[in-house]
């Protein structure tokens, strides 16, 4: 691994070490890191729709994204090993011993373009290294498995059955590019959760639980928008800028989208935007907060494009509607359930 370290890796590590001496949340993103950050926020990419991992000197297929180009092609399967990559009709490049991120960069590409993969099928005998070449047309891939999702938990209390709707929110994502371009189908946490609530109400659930465990945050805008689904109207978070000015972000729409019983699950890894949402639900007495004390991040970052990569820069602090800061304090649950 040390031999595979590039100068770009060293530069990123050095700049981030320097930045952290001033602020733990300001960091530099190399072009590759910036691309992955954008993918995680938009939940979309252009490629073949395969999750890969390093396996000694090879790159192995872990799973295929449902309805993605790789799955639809029916030419590769989980546990197959990729040993070569070619662009269109170009010669295939041997990638044995390559870093995972470098192989991924070769496989990703504009939708409509073709990539050829030299693959050792998992169905081969243990020592059979016979390979085959497959051609896959890249497409826009939606990472739905990383989006908010729902389930229903059936319980019985006092002889009466209850149904709880569970909405797991892994991150506060927002496709900034599509949103700014006016795309009516842009991806966002709030839009997905709103749809899931509608489906759960159709299933006649008795209450809803928003699961923010291990949710490290994301878009400040989405934290505000999601809060607005559950409150009548009013401020959602206070943002204090470096010049001392305080901006009040608020839900301006009358009426809550969902008015029924609800709870919010949090743990030590619930941070930033998760703490804004959980704190607002607690301050408005809108939901019961369950779990463990949250991470304790109370700052706001913005992305500054650079000639080479991006800078995630801290520019403000945020405060709960009550005026309290979550920095180093987190959100203390109403009911502590340490082991969930």
Which stretches of residues belong to each language-model region?
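Long, structured ligand/cofactor-binding scaffold of large enzymes
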Residues: 1-15
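A short acidic/small-residue loop/turn micro-motif
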Residues: 90, 333-334
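Conserved small/polar residues in nucleotide/adenosyl-binding loops
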Residues: 338-340
């Amino acid at each position: 691994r040390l031999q595979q370290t590039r100068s770009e890796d060293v530069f990123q590590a050095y700049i981030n070490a320097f930045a952290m001496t001033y602020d733990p949340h300001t960091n530099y993103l190399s072009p590759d890191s910036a691309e992955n950050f954008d993918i995680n926020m938009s939940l979309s990419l252009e490629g073949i729709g395969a999750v890969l991992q390093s396996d000694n000197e090879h790159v192995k297929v872990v799973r295929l994204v449902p309805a993605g180009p790789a799955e639809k092609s029916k030419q590769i399967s989980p546990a197959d090993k990729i040993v070569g990559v070619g662009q269109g009709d170009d010669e295939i490049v041997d990638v044995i011993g390559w870093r995972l991120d470098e192989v991924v960069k070769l496989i990703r590409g504009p939708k409509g373009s073709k990539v050829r993969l030299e693959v050792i099928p998992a169905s081969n005998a243990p020592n059979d290294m016979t390979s085959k070449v497959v051609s896959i047309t890249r497409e826009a891939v939606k990472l739905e498995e990383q989006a908010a999702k729902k389930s229903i938990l059936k319980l019985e209390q006092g002889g009466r059955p209850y149904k709880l709707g569970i909405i797991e929110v892994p991150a506060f994502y927002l496709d900034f590019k599509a949103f700014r371009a006016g795309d009516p189908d842009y991806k966002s946490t709030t839009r997905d959760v709103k749809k899931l609530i509608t489906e759960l109400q159709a299933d006649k659930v008795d209450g809803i639980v928003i699961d923010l465990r291990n949710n490290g945050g994301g878009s400040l805008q989405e934290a505000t928008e999601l809060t607005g689904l559950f409150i009548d109207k009013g401020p959602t978070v206070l943002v204090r800028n470096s010049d001392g000015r305080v901006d009040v972000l608020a839900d301006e729409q009358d009426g809550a989208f969902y008015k029924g019983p609800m709870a919010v699950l949090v743990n030590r890894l619930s941070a930033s935007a998760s703490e804004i949402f959980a704190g607002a639900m607690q301050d408005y007495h809108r939901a019961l907060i369950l779990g463990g004390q949250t991470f304790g991040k109370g700052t706001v970052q913005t992305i500054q494009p650079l000639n080479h990569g991006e800078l995630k820069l801290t520019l403000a602090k945020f405060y709960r509607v009550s005026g309290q800061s979550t920095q180093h304090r987190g959100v203390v649950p109403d009911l502590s359930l340490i082991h969930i």
